[in-house]
């Protein structure tokens, strides 16, 4: 991996010397790092050879209450193009909550497995829209679906995804894991492990992981850095436990950041702005 194996990369990927380097941190005391200052991440793109970005369906709505906001799609597509231009291979896992959420459908009386299947179909709509937006930016992209839909897009396989990534295409992954009862967060962690990604980027509406929902609790504290074990033990709801566990078992760090501003993905990769880094212990 050559220059990828610099000291910053090792700290993020393997947790080496990580705890005592945090800004304003607690060293090796075992307490998560908190604070309001910008989080310093690996400064070189060489630290991240291949990434998977998790985009919720809500992230594609912009100011709308549902559906797709074309300006938001264009902004995210332009950001992804800039990431690819720097030689980083990028896969994107999209959710479907802007159209339908399986768990909400189940709460309204739809059988859970069927509700999740409907939700997976919603992710395909989002993936096709994002693929088109990326291509409009002049960047090659391919949608691969865990639910075979040959009339619309390629079926997902590890080999196909790696092929397209190797050709410099942004791979948009639809259909979650292809199975009910699994979230698209878990799908992102699964694809991250399966595709040997160096980093999972969780795009949210807030600038990192908080001790509680900052929109509901003004006293919520933002963490600069956590380990996977800490995130699981504290039941931090930014990702589900299965996703954190998959990332932990495969040694993949996670950056949680806000997607609401232009250039947000690029900024998080460069270590600019606020975010939370969740690393192996």
How would you describe each model-predicted region?
Residues 4, 12-18, 34-281:
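C-terminal catalytic "cap/lid" subdomain
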Residues 23-25:
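Short Gly/Ser/Thr- and charged-rich N-terminal loops/segments
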């Amino acid at each position: 991996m050559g220059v990828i194996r610099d000291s910053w990369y090792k700290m993020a990927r393997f947790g080496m010397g990580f705890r005592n380097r945090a800004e304003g941190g607690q060293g090796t005391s075992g307490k998560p790092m908190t604070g309001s200052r910008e989080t310093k991440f690996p400064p070189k793109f060489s630290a991240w050879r291949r990434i998977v970005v998790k985009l919720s369906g809500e992230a594609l709505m912009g100011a709308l209450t549902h559906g797709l906001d074309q300006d938001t799609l264009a902004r995210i597509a332009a950001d992804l193009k800039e990431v690819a231009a720097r030689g980083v291979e990028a896969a994107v896992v999209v959710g479907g909550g802007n159209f339908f959420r399986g768990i909400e459908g189940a709460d309204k009386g739809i059988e859970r497995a069927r509700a999740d299947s409907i939700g997976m179909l919603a992710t395909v709509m989002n993936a096709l829209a994002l693929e088109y937006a990326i291509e409009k930016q002049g960047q090659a992209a391919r949608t691969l679906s865990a639910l075979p839909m040959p009339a619309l897009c390629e079926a997902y396989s590890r080999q196909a995804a790696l092929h397209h990534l190797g050709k410099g295409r942004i791979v948009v992954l639809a259909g979650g894991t292809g199975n009910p009862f699994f979230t698209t967060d878990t799908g992102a962690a699964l694809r991250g492990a399966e595709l040997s990604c160096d980093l999972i980027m969780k795009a949210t509406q807030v600038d990192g992981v908080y001790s509680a929902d900052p929109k509901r609790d003004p006293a919520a504290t933002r963490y600069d850095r956590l380990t996977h074990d800490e995130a699981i033990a504290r039941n931090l709801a930014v990702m589900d436990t299965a996703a954190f566990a998959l990332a932990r078992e495969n040694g993949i760090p996670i950056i949680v950041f806000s997607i609401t501003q232009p250039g947000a993905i690029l900024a998080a990769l460069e270590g600019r702005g606020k975010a939370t880094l969740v690393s192996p212990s």
